[in-house]
Amino acid sequence: MCTGGSNMGIINSNLTKLGSFLGNEKLYIPEYQRGYSWEETQLDDFWIDLLQIYEENVRDEHFFGQVVIHKNKEDGKRYIIDGQQRISTTIILLDILRTKFKEIADSTNNNDANDDSEDINAKYIGRISDSKKEQYLSMGGVDKEFFFEYVQKRGAIDYTDKKFD
């Protein structure tokens, strides 16, 4: 847990559904946090965790990992103190799903797939356009520009790896 000066505050300590957590309000990763650093081992563990949820049909409750949030009293922003790698990876996965749903919608005129793509965008990633930058996760440091350009902007990354098909 964090300790610090008068602008530090504990939000809560409870279990929250991932969808509610991500779509609640904007999250920030402080500038002092290390950059995104997960490698294949951590990504494999993340994927295995997701597959286990799917295979065991555990949809209601599953401990997805600890996330520590600090709500700064001065600027009112919610900063991720611990759990940034898992949250960032989740947003990357959601971007892949958003892109795949959009590809399905475009190639088959499937309105449900298009709606799913739009829902992911609106609820978890944010609306990004020339006039709007409403991303729900604002990275810090060296990752900020890359994450915005290649993950949060719709369709910026070409996911051609067969692992995602």
Where are these regions (language model features)?
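Glycine- and hydrophobic-rich flexible loops that cap the catalytic core of alpha/beta enzyme folds
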Residues: 2-165
